Regions:
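Short secondary-structure subsegments characteristic of cysteine-rich extracellular domains
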Residues: 158, 162-172
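A domain-level signal for the mature, folded cores of soluble proteins
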Residues: 1-129, 169-214
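Extracytoplasmic
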Residues: 113-115, 135-137, 160-162
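Extended serine/threonine-enriched, polar tracts that run as long, contiguous segments within proteins
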Residues: 132, 137-157
Length: 214
């Protein structure tokens, strides 16, 4: 390697070229039983223990547990009617002898269609033997709404980095998952190929430099 630099990019899922990372969302899966959104592939593999290299930042220093991730995936709230029901006999609810009716409990959960973008970090380097500029992906992160800012019309959604997956450790999982090929639907890609071959459009928002990644 003659030279190299680490760069961070954001992949906007509203761009058509990036649709294979987003679709099919829930509701479209039956028409494409062999394909799932990238978000579902990642979250399912984490829950099943197939992906274990999951971190809280793109520097891959502090791991996130499944419990940490699940705390950001959903929230449970009680409706006003449910609170009134609880206030009628609050001691019984505190002791657990009574429970709020299920119809008055609201659960909000992050779904594949909530993913707004992906952030990726990779390493560009010049291979002097082959005389080529090459790219090696290091990590990927779904950007989703903070679940605690969802479901309230008066609140402005805030977006968070859900988790960072160390890409080299997830390649087996991504190689087994199919993505749509815009040019030839009869021949699907794998997510591993799509990401590693940079078949997406990204905008650089950070780069490695002497000032400390700005």
């Amino acid at each position: 390697i003659l030279m190299g630099k680490r760069m961070w990019e954001v992949i906007d899922l509203d761009e058509r070229v990036n649709f294979p990372l987003y679709f099919p969302v829930d509701g479209d899966v039956m028409s494409s039983p062999d394909r799932r959104p990238l978000y579902n592939v990642l979250v399912s593999a984490i829950k099943e223990g197939k992906i274990t290299e999951v971190y809280d930042s793109s520097y891959f220093t502090t791991k996130k547990t499944l419990k940490d991730i699940e705390a950001s995936l959903f929230k449970i709230d009680t409706s006003d009617v449910g609170r009134e029901q609880m206030n009628e006999d609050i001691d019984a609810y505190r002791k657990g002898t009574k429970k709020i009716s299920e119809e008055y409990i609201r659960k909000t959960e992050i779904q594949a269609y909530d993913v707004d973008a992906y952030k990726v970090v990779g390493y560009w380097y010049f291979d002097k033997r082959q005389g080529e500029l090459k790219y090696r992906m290091l990590g990927i992160c779904p950007v989703v709404p903070d679940v605690y800012t969802m479901g309230d019309d008066s609140a402005q959604k805030e977006y968070i980095e859900l988790f960072w997956v160390y890409f080299p450790s997830s390649r087996d999982v991504l190689h087994a998952a199919k993505a749509f090929n815009n040019r030839n639907s009869a021949m699907s890609f794998t997510f591993d190929h799509l990401l590693n071959a940079r078949r997406f459009s990204g905008v650089v928002y950070l780069e490695e430099n002497v000032y400390g990644d700005r």
